[in-house]
């Protein structure tokens, strides 16, 4: 079969929050089984069964448990706190790990996956949280069914990321997640999906399943998986979650993905009618392994490691090893060892997630070229006959011998209902770099988060990661952070030239010491308009842009294009003047001061600089040029072609009659973007597309101050100077306008060119300007590398049985405001606010005073915070739209009904749609509350984003069953 690449890995296993820490756990022979007492188990029932690994009569149980599974960051996923506490922690954990797997792959869900045929295949079995919530009917609400449904585990992920490929949960017990991997591969191979997320999740939240397994004699008395050992007496339960990102290998190679492993083949089968429903079946195990080998095109003798099911039962272990022997010994020489082991000896049996745990273990082993130790093996099970065979069990971390061909391994998972799965893995191909282009002297690292605390936490993670991975290349770190991470509102940009400097800069940020090259800000959701200002004469010097010329092909190509066009007009090559050999610098400097060369050189340099900024996605909303700079501005605005512009420039310093003749030969067009004329100081009109305008331009005065005033009046706040010196910045300061907005240079004489360029780019980024980061590095050979994943800001969301009173199912009708304070859920503060609104409503000037709008905003914050389930004094963001807050149609209907009841208004449903926020809704309500005699005054000011029409609730709220 066609090979499938594993390009991203995310995991949470006991003692390991990510793949790196999981490998450390495995490599260091760590057994994470521990006692836990913080789960709502039925301890009395557990103690009745002696085989359950409890400690005396204490309320604790042994297992491979995750920390703080009741904690979650709903804000990150735009889920309301109210709904979050009804969502199975397995769903919540899966969302986080899936996001981490995509970050590990360097994939941006919003731009690369949204609306695509991306499949989600997940394994899950346990329904413990549903059992907890079902214990008291009083706690049931509209979110229970969706929140605890196993199928929704996959569907919610697809919904939140807008993934439109297959989305399903597979339950084959212990083999669930490996079966999910198999079907994800099939979806890719058939073309049904172009990318898949596959894996599984398992949490132990109640005692019922443990009691049942104890009755079935499946649990080890000492709480240890002693796989292959003579003392094996069952397994210990464990928790975990793992997700891998899968892609066809050819596509991954084409896209430059970080390939971490390869799936060569996979197979799934069933025991059928055998010794018993839950009994292992040797012939079926052999069959599924042979099928996987056949699909992979691999001989049994090529497999050098197998991650086994290894559930530590005397019969099951011997059947599995004997099945492996029967298959893997075929064609194998005595000196061709095949190692076997089980991750269950480290973390317990994570049941539905056990297959993905084994697969991730093998992927990490292939990456490191080492095989972890198999724990708790003191005396081999006498029924396992591997003495004097190539089958071996590692008891220490050991090298995985390299071979001429890539290393190959197998992973098995056998469900206790008889569904078996086997996957063949191959190590990733080596990455080869052929970097011919001279590297930049500086680099730009971008980091962002949804909140300031998360940004601080992420910076801390980066520091630790950089120190733990000294071999990572700085360019690859910065590349991955830019193209492989979503860019949120709270941003940091750092300009550096070494990893040591990067670590120091991040430490400076943590302490609040914003040093040179360190920029942070909360990005605007609506970035300011950008004006490009093209510098005039007086800023020229030899070697301006030399670093850019040697390191940036787009800049170099633009300079060389101008040089070729100018050859018929200039005696000397422009390149010889701009970038002379050291021995020719004095002559070149003298020539550059001659008008015949000054103007063409400045034009070519600024045109190339513009092309470079444009290739990074930084494009102006308006352009303005000072003197000769206006020719560049007009060119990029489309007034004339590059060839015509250079023809004009080459003749501009000559006799006026000659220039006039040339000007009348040029083809002119109206500007395609806003162009400020420095002849008039206003927006250019149709005159700019005439020869006479450019003839007058030669001797006309430059209206710089007026031009800048025009830009300010048009709302421009970001100014990027396209020139070799920030001359216009100095002139603007003289106009006393420089403190209004952001002024950014492209270059500064005497400073490293990349340091200046990247500083300006970093400031644009933190301000919220969209950057084409792929374009930024398109000319370099970069590699995506593993970087820290998002630090979720978790809080506790858990339903404690017996603590919640029955919820009211309907809202009260219109009552007096004082009654509402006691008979509805409105707080005393809201009652006061409603009194103020009612008083203000009777005033003729209600719609004219901003404090009334403030009252409405406060009222809505209180109501929405209550409906969303916010804790304490937390209030929703007034500029965040309702769906970003996590509100759904049920919540919006509740809000609408409450507003109508409180304010005696008829509120149309669609007022809540199309990006509505608290501010826009308050404005609409404000308009409805205005007395008749002032309605006309305010009507013209109303936000026409919403068309007020009536929509029935039944037309809006639809639940598909």
Listing of model-derived features with the role each one plays in the protein:
Residues 1-437, 590, 611, 640-654, ...:
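Condensing-enzyme catalytic core of the thiolase-fold
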Residues 1-9, 41, 48, 54, ...:
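Flexible, low-complexity inter-domain linkers and amphipathic docking helices that mediate domain-domain
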Residues 10-12, 280-295, 408-530, 546, ...:
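Flexible catalytic loop/linker elements that gate and position reactive groups at enzyme active sites
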Residues 63-69, 669-692, 764:
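Short helix-loop capping/hinge segments that flank enzyme active sites or metal/cofactor-binding pockets
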Residues 177-180, 630, 889:
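Catalytic nucleophile loop
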Residues 449, 517-657, 718-731, 746-750, ...:
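FabD-like malonyl-/acyl-CoA
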Residues 497, 523, 562, 601-623, ...:
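Flexible, low-complexity segments
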